[in-house]
């Protein structure tokens, strides 16, 4: 017989989910397992590349609902196949299912963050704006993964991406 995960048990399961890289569980928003490189693989990759060049093995992303954080490192090679796979690492329904375990009657903070090529972009809002946050996270992830290193530098110094100002006004 299946047992519903609630309260402290849900947080405990979410914390273990963050570290063991499991996927497809009852509460994780991610569909793919964590693919963090081993220390040996990381060193090998960076010793072959020039010090001033940025050729990441992948990217980090996270979803958080209140104090519960789900993190993943995913491999990304910059190809169309790799992009399609990376964009499918989570879907609207998996995020909604995970969030529903932590959302109660009160408003809590929800955040999506992606780190790629040394730049981190985070979008957040209250639980009442979760659907809009998911839409923005989809667009943000697609845009960030398709940028060249020089475009990333330009966007970092240019401020927030298009649409953030409107979202901040809506969520107030």
Curated annotation (Swiss-Prot):
The keyword RNA-binding applies. GO terms for cellular component: virion component. The keyword RNA-binding applies. It comes from the Viruses. One of its GO terms (molecular function) is RNA binding. Signal peptide: none annotated. SUPFAM superfamilies: Tombusvirus P19 core protein, VP19. Homodimer. Viral suppressor of RNA silencing which binds specifically to silencing RNAs (siRNAs). Acts as a molecular caliper to specifically select siRNAs based on the length of the duplex region of the RNA. Belongs to the tombusvirus protein p19 family. This is RNA silencing suppressor p19. It comes from Pelargonium necrotic spot virus (PeNSV).
């Amino acid at each position: 017989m299946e047992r519903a995960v609630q309260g402290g048990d849900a947080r405990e399961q979410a914390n273990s989910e963050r570290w063991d890289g499991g996927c497809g569980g009852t509460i994780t928003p991610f569909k793919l397992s964590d693919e963090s490189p081993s220390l040996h693989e990381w060193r090998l990759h960076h010793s072959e590349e020039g010090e001033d060049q940025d050729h990441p093995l992948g990217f980090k992303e996270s979803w958080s609902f209140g104090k519960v954080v789900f993190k993943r490192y995913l491999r990304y090679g910059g190809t169309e196949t790799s992009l399609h796979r990376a964009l499918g690492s989570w879907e609207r329904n998996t995020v909604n299912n995970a969030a529903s375990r932590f959302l109660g009657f009160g408003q809590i903070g929800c955040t999506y963050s992606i780190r790629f090529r040394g730049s981190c972009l985070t979008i957040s809002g209250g639980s009442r704006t979760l659907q809009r946050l998911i839409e923005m996270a989809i667009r943000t992830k697609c845009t960030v993964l398709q940028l060249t290193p020089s475009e990333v530098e330009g966007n970092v110094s240019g401020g927030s991406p298009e649409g953030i100002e409107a979202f901040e006004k809506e969520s107030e």
